[in-house]
């Protein structure tokens, strides 16, 4: 550890002299440059600017226009963008964003867990202090398969690579856009008001400031039947970016963001789908009718089980063109804080049993420092080498759990009363990496890259009941790598084949006190991919891939309900031998002058190892993994038609089809959701110069109640968590630019 600390100090000292810059060249190249020809969609999947058709990685790209058309306002909405990507929005479970790619992800309530799908914003890894809200975004790239060589620890399944709009020194501009809906109006099952704004101010001929912000106010999707009030779920955020082209060779980029949010009565949390006959009668008495799509709960206490969130972060980025090399330095810091009042987890005052949590809070602080040196893109041997350091500290306050049971004679007993524990988790790592591409011929390229990671994960735990302490350490020392071939069949068709060994750090699981913490081993996938990319219709990109991956020590969470106390108990564990294999095809870009489209289909056979016994003691070996649909289809498209001089009409569609989804490591049918379509769309008009637009939109037209989470034996019944994706929304969209 001493060597690691000395190396960290050396990196920090060197940063004083580092010459580097914006979020790479993408920050200084106007957005129009990436859109002047659809065949030249520019991505940064290999930490340099490249055409998407030249990158030997399966990628789904969503432009700003598509994100706004599909109303992608937060990470959870990214479900609709790529068939390979799933985002689970269950509260406190969406580690590092909660994403899974090709069936592989990390769903965990443990504060010591890290993600399998990394979230990277303007080159900065978000760790577990990730952003939630998406606004003023230029594009999003979904990179599939292990990306650890260039992106680091939390990318064993893939990366969500987000690029926001850069400041523009050439002009003053601004924009305001809104999405407005009201519960009960035009069939909308909840209300939501989204307001986003941006202003771009040139400071000089070589620098500019861009400030953007948003407010996302939602009423529902849950309703307190006792008071008749819909839950308020509100979020606010602002981002500032300052870009300065100091010289022709040196660029400085300073970024900062702040966000704040609150939820009432648990926000989007469990409601009852079914229960025993006796309990159903009790639930009916306070206004709850258990069933699919139930939005009601009943709490008499004001604002019980509510939470608040606040987070901020910033980065300083320098880029210097030193002739044969481009040198980059990125220094970043993030901080997130959440607090929860605690309350009745069942959210049903009428039940004889109550599972109650106490007030608690969590703080996450993340510091990262990265240095890179990159060769010119037109060299025979292109390469990127660098070093990366991260230090993430999580402090989780004790959370009391109590179970109370009201007996028929009126006496209340408390079979469980745990005061919880204070958990302090430090995750520190240092890595060196490099990846190169050798142009063996004009058509053939050879890829080779590797990353060495050394780190230390530690947990200090103090039992709130008796003050006893425990300490756990997990040291890591691993190499991940990537190799492959890439061949240009002709000017518009490229093929590739790669092999990658990924790596995701271990966990120190923190079960409910007085149970002691334990180590969950690092996750190591061995993955193979072959694919082709083609340019069609003069500009659209076709991306086809075949993939296979076997994961050693897949990190999973197994949740069961204690039949005596009815307490939900979740344990983190390793499952060795999980496999995912299949095929995917994506088509995105502009099909014609009037039609743009992003569509894709994936077949993913992601399975438990043979003989694996699930939480219900049944053999589910070879069955589909939890949270992973075997088939998924996505379609987003817009057709534009001139109506009058200066005015165009548009019609957009947004459709998803998923096969049956399993939500727990069991064979219970009640913990799955059927195959289903989710259909949405938009119709409206916009000015020919796109300065103004107005439209009507609908999401989940047929009101299909796909849950975020299903849990059997919840309060002697079945519980579901529903989010905004689970109900119909109808509203008005307005947009103005100046």
Where do the language-model regions lie?
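Structural signature of Gram-negative outer-membrane beta-barrels, strongest in the C-terminal barrel
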Residues: 243-247, 373-376, 388-390, 423-551, ...
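Surface-exposed extracellular loop regions of Gram-negative outer-membrane beta-barrel proteins
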Residues: 262-273, 393-395, 456, 486-529, ...
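Membrane-embedded beta-barrel scaffold of Gram-negative outer-membrane proteins
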Residues: 196, 315-344, 488, 492-502, ...
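Gram-negative outer-membrane beta-barrel transporters
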Residues: 383-384, 442, 446, 548-550, ...
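Acidic, small-polar-rich N-terminal luminal/periplasmic segments of exported/outer-membrane proteins
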Residues: 36-169, 530
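N-terminal Sec signal peptide and the immediately downstream disordered periplasmic leader
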Residues: 1-70, 76-80, 200, 248-249, ...
